[in-house]
UniProtKB/Swiss-Prot annotation:
The keyword Oxidoreductase applies. Its EC number is 1.14.11.51. It comes from Arabidopsis thaliana (Mouse-ear cress). Binds 1 Fe(2+) ion per subunit. This is DNA N(6)-methyladenine demethylase ALKBH1A. The gene is ALKBH1A. It catalyses: an N(6)-methyl-2'-deoxyadenosine in DNA + 2-oxoglutarate + O2 = a 2'-deoxyadenosine in DNA + formaldehyde + succinate + CO2. Mostly expressed in siliques, to a lower extent in roots, seedlings and rosette leaves, but barely in cauline leaves, stems and flowers. The keyword DNA damage applies. One of its GO terms (cellular component) is nucleus.
Length: 345
């Protein structure tokens, strides 16, 4: 799911791949420092669509850029792109309170078994990862024969590892958390939904939120059924390569995508990677819908912004710190979370 640095030269020939390389995070040495401090390489962001700014201008004077139209005007306008039918962008769709709620759920509840994460393949189901990271615990291979792992306090590590068992800190595992799945579980090895796997239903509050935002993209007379969700976790330098979300049965139903945390660049391509993609900012609280023809469009995340001057999460950090202490705020300072809710059947 996450992009490898090893990409063939042939891939550079597509418009989508060129855009990925244009916006990806690269470092360059700062000549001002003798120890050769590295800084993010400047990039040209002038061509990015900024729906936050577009929304402000529209609310002030009703003006829209060429190729952009408004599909719905309520308390929060919904924007569309003329040559990408089925794509909807809702800026600031989630309040700060809602953003804080779903950040906390994404870190505490969503990785809990029976939900699966990228860690399952190596460590099996992991309970209470976030709390264990807060408490500086270490995951130790407790049983070499059955590959069972257990969290220990740091003071107990020497005793726990006397049999040369492997260990890894909970804080490292939290930072390496890349995805979790809610509702019907997605099998990444088979690239399909496995209804035989144990699972819990998606939380009611998240279902209702998804239904509310999905309504504008639904066929007339139908209601969105949230049956599965994938939560993506991005850290510094992480990307999500160009891909299609094509494992659901009915592409007329939208994917509801909620952005939380650091600002990102989103690429929306066409049905071929040769089609030049639209590049746009995604900020915390934005919601994107992709339905119908838009489900056939390649899309990805080539960059997240984690610097204080570019992440655009000052208010979110303050709210998180006030509500829940510094640990959530410290995590989100260098992270982005994306919740994608889907109707599977």
């Amino acid at each position: 799911m996450y992009e490898s640095a090893n990409v063939s030269d042939d891939a550079d020939r597509t418009a989508f791949r060129r855009a990925e390389k244009k916006y990806k995070l690269y470092y360059e040495q700062d000549s001002k420092f003798s120890r050769k401090k590295k800084l993010p390489k400047p990039i040209d962001l002038s061509e990015l669509l900024d729906f936050n700014l577009i929304s402000q201008n529209f609310n002030n004077d009703g003006v829209l850029p060429d190729g952009i139209r408004v599909s719905k005007v309520d308390s929060s306008p919904v924007f569309c792109i003329d040559n990408r039918p089925g794509f909807y962008f809702i800026p600031d769709a989630l309040s700060l309170k809602e953003q804080c709620k779903w950040i906390k759920e994404s870190l505490t509840s969503f990785p809990q078994p029976p939900n699966r994460t990228n860690h399952n393949a190596i460590y099996g189901p992991i309970d209470d990862l976030f709390d264990s990271a807060k408490e500086n615990k270490v995951l130790v291979q407790d049983d070499l024969t059955n590959n069972k792992w257990k969290f220990y306090e740091e003071v107990d590590i020497e005793k726990a590892t006397r049999s040369s068992c492997k260990s890894v800190s909970a804080s490292v595992l939290l930072r390496k958390l890349r995805w979790s799945t809610l509702g019907l579980q997605f099998d990444w090895s088979k690239r399909n939904y496995d209804v035989s796997l144990p699972h819990n239903n998606i939380p009611d509050a998240l279902c209702q939120l998804a239904k509310t935002h999905a309504a504008i993209a639904m066929p007339d007379g139908e209601e969105f059924r949230p049956e599965g969700a994938i939560v993506n976790y991005f850290g510094i330098g992480d990307t999500l390569g160009g891909h299609l979300d094509d494992m659901e049965a009915d592409w007329s139903k939208p994917i509801v995508s909620m952005s939380l945390g650091c600002k990102a660049i989103f690429l929306l391509g066409g049905k071929s990677k040769d089609d030049p993609p639209h590049a746009m900012y995604l900020r915390s609280g934005d919601v994107v819908l992709m339905a119908g023809e838009a489900r056939e469009c390649f899309h990805g995340i080539p960059r997240i912004f984690t610097g204080e001057e570019n992440a655009d999460i000052g208010a979110l950090e303050s709210e998180l710190s006030h509500e829940s202490g510094h640990f959530f705020a410290e995590y989100i300072k260098t992270s982005r979370i994306n919740i994608n809710i889907r109707q599977v059947f």
